[in-house]
Each structure stands twice: as structure tokens, then as C-alpha cells.
């Protein structure tokens, strides 16, 4: 990187830590902020507020400012739980308006090659939620990646002995894709066409 002031170099370094932001993008963002100094304070304030106020729901582990979150505390169908990898997957399903139950966010997917085991995910908490007898169906909505499929298979093996119906999103979602990037109509078709495992 060219030599800039320490402050600008630090800003670019922090921006590069964001997913999908390389050095050129980080520089472009930094220079944009410098051109619009009024935005700097608003951005800094928003970042601080997110850090202070946003946390995981103690029930489903979605991102929320309230505990429990609005989905867990609302009048949704508590007999169906949709299991997703990340909070942004939950948001994609909510955008489709195809699912009326509750969620459980694993905070990742199994990946033995990367050292991610069941203990690293919110699987134990999911199994605890299923013990009450209220849940009739678990919809597994992990991504259609190697890790997502491994997670779905593992969850199916854990849940089936509980005599709870286990379903999987239909394969209308392209293999190798993340729910976060799929349009709402495709997600809706996938939810409606889910199949039992």
C-alpha cells in the first residue's frame, strides 16, 4: 500500500477486515468517507450502537436488540422450527414470507477440515429445545454446500430418534449457493416444496 497518514492506513486496515473488501475497495470507502465528513460521525455512532445493543437471542440465537427476539416472543407456530446456519439465512427466509414458524440459528455449519465440530455450533441448544414435546417438525434449511449437507445429515440423525418430523428445503435453491443471496420467490418455492428426510 502507498504511504498514507497513520489514521488513514489504520482505517483502510480495519475496512479490509470486512468480508469481500480488499485493499482497493477499502481505499475507495476511506476516500468516500473523507469526501463526506458528516457521514463519518453517523457511521461511527451506528457501529458503536450495534456493538452495545445487538446480541444473540437466548432462545433461537438470531441477532436482536430484545431478548427474546420478536419471533420467539411473538405468536408464531411454535410446533415448527426452521434450522439455519447464520442470521442472514433467517432474514432471507423471512423476506420470502413462506415460513410461519420459529427459528434456530446454528451460528455456522459443520466443517471438520476447518475444525468446526458440533460443539462449536448451537446444536446442543437445539436438542434441548426439542425435548419439551411441543415441536412437531424441524425444517433443516442449511445451505446446499458440503458443510451444509453434512450439518443437515448430522441433525437428521440426532433428531429422528425423538419422533419429530424432519424436513429439508426443496432443492429449488442452486447447489453451492447461500440463502442470503437467493431471491424471495425461489426461497418461497423451496420452503413450500420441502421434503421429509
From Swiss-Prot:
Domain Toprim: 79-174
Gene Ontology terms describing biological process: DNA recombination; DNA repair
UniProt keyword ATP-binding, yes or no: no
Zn finger region (C4-type): 57-72
Annotated GO MF terms: DNA binding; zinc ion binding
InterPro entries referenced in this protein's UniProt entry, alphabetically: DNA_Rcmb_RecR, Rcmb_RecR, Rcmb_RecR_Znf, TOPRIM_dom, TOPRIM_RecR
Classification via Gene3D superfamilies: 3.30.60.80, 3.40.1360.10, 6.10.250.240, RecR Domain 1 (1.10.8.420)
Keywords for this protein: DNA damage, DNA recombination, DNA repair, Metal-binding, Zinc, Zinc-finger
HAMAP family linked to this entry: RecR (MF_00017)
Role: May play a role in DNA repair. It seems to be involved in an RecBC-independent recombinational process of DNA repair. It may act with RecF and RecO.
Family label: Belongs to the RecR family.
Name used for this protein in its record: Recombination protein RecR
Species, as recorded: Geobacter sp. (strain M21)
Lineage: Bacteria, Pseudomonadati, Thermodesulfobacteriota, Desulfuromonadia, Geobacterales
Amino acid at each position: 500500500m502507498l504511504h498514507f497518514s497513520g489514521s488513514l492506513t489504520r482505517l483502510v486496515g480495519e475496512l479490509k477486515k470486512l468480508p469481500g473488501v480488499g485493499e482497493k475497495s477499502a481505499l475507495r470507502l476511506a476516500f468516500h468517507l473523507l469526501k463526506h465528513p458528516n457521514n463519518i460521525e453517523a457511521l461511527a455512532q451506528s457501529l458503536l450502537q450495534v456493538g452495545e445493543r445487538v446480541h444473540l437471542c437466548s432462545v433461537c440465537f438470531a441477532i436482536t436488540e430484545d431478548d427474546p427476539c420478536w419471533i420467539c416472543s411473538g405468536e408464531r407456530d411454535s410446533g415448527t422450527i426452521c434450522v439455519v446456519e447464520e442470521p442472514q439465512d433467517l432474514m432471507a427466509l423471512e423476506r420470502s414470507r413462506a415460513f410461519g414458524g420459529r427459528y434456530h440459528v446454528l451460528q455456522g455449519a459443520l466443517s471438520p477440515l476447518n475444525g468446526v465440530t458440533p460443539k462449536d455450533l448451537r446444536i446442543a441448544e437445539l436438542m434441548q429445545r426439542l425435548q419439551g414435546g411441543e415441536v412437531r417438525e424441524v425444517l433443516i434449511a442449511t445451505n446446499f454446500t458440503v458443510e451444509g449437507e453434512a450439518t443437515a445429515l448430522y441433525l437428521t440423525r440426532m433428531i429422528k430418534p425423538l419422533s419429530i418430523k424432519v424436513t429439508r428445503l426443496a432443492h429449488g435453491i442452486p447447489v453451492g449457493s447461500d440463502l442470503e443471496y437467493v431471491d424471495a420467490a425461489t426461497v418461497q418455492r423451496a420452503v413450500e416444496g420441502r421434503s421429509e428426510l
